[in-house]
Amino acid sequence: MDYVTTINTEHSTYSATDPKRTLIRMTRGRLVAGWIYFPSGPAGHLHMTVLRAAYQVAPIDPQQGYALDDAVVTLAPGFDLHQPPYQLTILTWNTSTLYDHTLTISLTLDPFFGKPPKRPFLSSLFPSLRKNKVEL
């Protein structure tokens, strides 16, 4: 399942100490991949971090954040969302005094991770194999 969110962060409104908070609500499963797209234009003014509950998960070092221009950051989180709330919080702030800036984040979640696959029994695919109906 893919979750895509576009976040516009207004200039002179949010800061590192008071960032914009955007929730990405998902379902139970494992986050297996994702990417963050910074279009050309922010020139390092648009900053972003990803939180899971109170913990920063991207970038993993809480002293760092993403602030890029015309770049795609590939994510390979590989962690499970097995307890509610099934969501991530995206923190963004814009240090530009003139322009709003936008980024796009996409996350791929495998809702079936850890569950045995549902496979039909052979007898449902081949009626002649059903009990008491085998013909030789």
Positions of PLM-derived features:
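Beta-strand-centric surfaces of beta-sandwich/beta-rich domains
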Residues: 1-28, 35-136
